[in-house]
Amino acid sequence: MEIDFNRIAVKVGSNVLTRRDGTLDVTRMSALVDQIAELHKAGIEIILVSSGAVASGRSEVRPTKKLDSVDQRQLFSAVGQAKLINRYYELFREHGIPVGQVLTMKENFSTRRHYLNQKNCMTVMLENGVIPIVNENDTISVSELMFTDNDELSGLIASMMDAQALIILSNIDGIYNGSPADPESQVIREIEQGKDLSSYIQTSKSSFGRGGMLTKTNIARKVADEGITVIIANGKRDNILVKIMNNEELNYTRFIPSPEPVSSIKKWIAHSEGFAKGELHINHCATELLFSDKAVSILPVGITDVIGEFEKDDIVRIIDFGGKPIGVGKANCDSSQARETMGKHGKNPVVHYDLSLLQI
């Protein structure tokens, strides 16, 4: 293996795993498992984030009455996940590789304790040669707390597990500099930090999934900013994973990772904006200090308002003097104490500078 990654996360999209009628493409699944098994036997730790449960279930059961979107997802995923994981179990067993099912929810990433509990579980699996197969637990997720799609979930998993690379497998070769349907368009091979891609990205989503290229790009940027290589490639290309790891010449998009290391807790905070329990509104002076070159904590004297109820260690949004969200941070106290000390000098920080991220 020419690319020196010891641990990778691989996300397989619904359009890779399903045929047009929604049934599982077992031939494609088998080919992907063969590739993952080859990498696993070469000593690479792999976490598989697999879509396909809802699409799989959709082809197995027909509702007796009209269901809303959440009820449909719960029904189809309950049936489809059993079918999906059973197929993975059988395919990996042919290679003598044990797998473990990890069903998670967005809520499980909202507190540091739950976050670390999940990380520990999957770390133990990897240490014992087990490949974790991760999916969202759609059967008990509610619409407002669902992941945008499994691209978002895979980004969280790659970050949480300190993966060196996240490979997102879709049904196109990567990000194009025009419409993928245009024969003149070409795949953008490398994307550096800060490169504007807005003119290239189409907002359409897949037939069986919730995600589109815009979501993939946003997740890829965030994960690459944490020092993790992100690759978007075509999961229907023969032996794509092995070819990527062998650094063979082929079309895919690679997001160049930041060279700066990011701490585990900052990785968690970077993905936690959607879990914020409250808001800290700060004045003009505090806002300017936060964006200066100095490492500055959020002190009570700079806080003008505390919105919502939160406990110590919860994630809170940081709102500037104009009402614009500028970041998130880990609260150093609960909301009652924050209100009590608000505007006062000589008090402990409400958010320490090490535990905040601006302009996420």
Task: Walk through the language-model features, giving the residues of each.
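C-terminal catalytic "cap/lid" subdomain
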Residues: 1-65, 70-98, 102-360
